[in-house]
Amino acid sequence: MSIKSDKWIRYMAQAHGIIEPFEPRQIREANNARIISYGTSSYGYDIRCSNEFKIFTNINSAVVDPKNFDASSFVDVQSDVCIIPPNSFALARTVEYFRIPRSVLTICLGKSTYARCGIIVNITPLEPEWEGHVTLEFSNTTPLPAKVYANEGVAQVVFFESDELCETSYRDRSGKYQGQTGVTLPKA
């Protein structure tokens, strides 16, 4: 299994639509202002979060249960900035829609800009033949409110290609998050 370069990422995005919309280079500025970078990097792709957020709140004194998650535990927000309460979290989705080839597995890692502020981005691997918008989880580990910026870089996707095809892909086993298009809550 080998890590894939910027050349491979550009080719696969442009010829096979594995990332849409796709930015073939790193973008570090918008409207004459510095932003948290996104786009193609040397050995990965820096993804953006959309302006759709679900901010966790415990107004109902709920117990967090991944098998029976209470959707009313979230407040829906559409904004260019998400303010996450202290020691809480928010969900969002990527701007980019992914179509992962059968021979590829991706690992997603949070950007250091957020990590150095106590904001942790958690994303599970994108499995072979999975497709959809990626649901992002932002944990604010600080005792203060924390900002996440929409349409700017939040994490990096690193692509690994296997030397042989898997027997069963995410699509083959009808994965429960296949084709997701919005911020998707846990499914048991």
Swiss-Prot record:
It catalyses: dCTP + H2O + H(+) = dUTP + NH4(+). Keywords: Hydrolase, Nucleotide metabolism, Nucleotide-binding. Pfam families: DCD. It is an enzyme of class 3 (hydrolase). One of its GO terms (biological process) is dUTP biosynthetic process. NCBIfam families: dCTP_deam (TIGR02274). This is dCTP deaminase. The gene is dcd.
